[in-house]
From Swiss-Prot:
UniProt keyword list: Chloroplast, Electron transport, Heme, Iron, Membrane, Metal-binding, Photosynthesis, Photosystem II, Plastid, Signal, Thylakoid, Transport
Required cofactor names: heme c
The species this protein was found in: Porphyra purpurea
Pfam families for this protein: Cytochrom_C550
The protein's name: Photosystem II extrinsic protein V
Record's bilayer topology term: Peripheral membrane protein
Amino acid sequence: MLKRSSWLATLLGLLTVASVSTIVYAIELDEATRTVPLESSGRTVVLTPEQVKRGKRLFNNSCAICHNGGITKTNPNVGLDPESLGLATPQRDNIEALVDYMKDPTSYDGAESIAELHPSIKSAEIFPKMRNLTDEDLFTIAGHILLQPKIVSEKWGGGKIYY
């Protein structure tokens, strides 16, 4: 009985400490870091800390299975790094262009639709993880993609040497 009581007291003590302790899981990103390209004309947008968190969560739940670390598992020559996004046709290096891609993806050269092969809103019946994503969700995912090179630099889209 004494062992059980001391075990319960220890457990309650740990739970009490855990409930009153403040644990920081992420770094605070300044406004300059959270500023990403909005459209091809050069306009930018500052992501809120909430959008940053939500974008990361949605990316990890919906995209990371194939794009973990900014790579593309099915085509290691094309990643989500700024250079690859900028060389795509049309360029996919801003939020509006990435949202457009997530709605109706095209090949890297822009010549044909790949909606039946790549998860998208257009092919949500085939790829269920895309079914419930709103335009705001797509916005935050795109923001996450564009923010990562500022946080992890060349690791984002860097491939096997980093992940």
